């Protein structure tokens, strides 16, 4: 059983954390993140160390304990280093471009797919088959990357589609003729 909820979070220099009721705010060199945590989980701040504790040992509280600690740790890492995901477009004629606040994907449909850029996610298109996404919020970054990938997820026969940079696609053999 995981005991991640009991691990302490060491705050790097330049990072401030505060709690106002159930809202935790983390400020760092790259920005500020806020998140509401469960009132059943107690957070204590001792200088540069953050600890989490729970009142009871029910299964729900055990899950919330580890999840809350992981979410706050992701906030601390995000305001210090940030997060980045790279997507590759594989296929003949597949390309991406950025026009203003819209990501335009040409991925084999009759019309290009337009996606609005979220506020806290930065999009960079260094070449027309690569999309670089970066953000301080790991959750929003992962959700947007999954939305982009879902536009044309990789198929198992030729591997065409939008995939993460280091993603391995399990390939299938086609039918054999008689």
UniProtKB/Swiss-Prot annotation:
Organism: Limosilactobacillus reuteri (strain DSM 20016)
One Pfam entry name: Ribosomal_L6
InterPro entries linked to this entry: Ribosomal_uL6-like, Ribosomal_uL6-like_a/b-dom_sf, Ribosomal_uL6_a/b-dom, Ribosomal_uL6_bac-type, Ribosomal_uL6_CS
GO biological process: cytoplasmic translation
Role summary: This protein binds to the 23S rRNA, and is important in its secondary structure. It is located near the subunit interface in the base of the L7/L12 stalk, and near the tRNA binding site of the peptidyltransferase center.
Protein's UniProt name: Large ribosomal subunit protein uL6
GO molecular function, one term: rRNA binding
A Gene Ontology cellular-component term: cytosolic large ribosomal subunit
Keywords annotated in UniProt: Ribonucleoprotein, Ribosomal protein, RNA-binding, rRNA-binding
Quaternary structure note: Part of the 50S ribosomal subunit.
Family annotation (HAMAP family): Ribosomal_uL6_B (MF_01365_B)
Protein family: Belongs to the universal ribosomal protein uL6 family.
């Amino acid at each position: 059983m995981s005991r991640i909820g009991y691990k302490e979070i060491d705050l790097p220099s330049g990072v401030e954390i505060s709690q106002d009721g159930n809202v935790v705010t983390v400020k760092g060199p790259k920005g500020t993140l806020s998140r509401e945590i469960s009132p059943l989980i107690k957070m204590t701040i001792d200088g540069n160390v953050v600890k989490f504790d729970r009142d009871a040992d029910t299964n729900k509280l055990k899950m919330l304990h580890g999840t809350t600690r992981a979410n706050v740790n992701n906030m601390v890492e995000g305001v210090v280093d940030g997060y980045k995901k790279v997507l590759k477009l594989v296929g003949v004629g597949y390309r991406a471009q950025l026009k203003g606040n819209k990501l335009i994907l040409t991925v084999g449909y009759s019309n290009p797919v337009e996606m609005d850029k979220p506020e806290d996610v930065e999009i960079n298109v260094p070449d027309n088959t690569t999309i670089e996404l970066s953000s301080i919020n790991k959750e929003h970054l992962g959700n947007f990357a999954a939305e982009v990938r879902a536009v044309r997820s990789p198929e198992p026969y030729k591997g065409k589609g939008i995939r993460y940079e280091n993603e391995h696609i399990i390939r299938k053999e086609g039918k054999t003729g008689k």
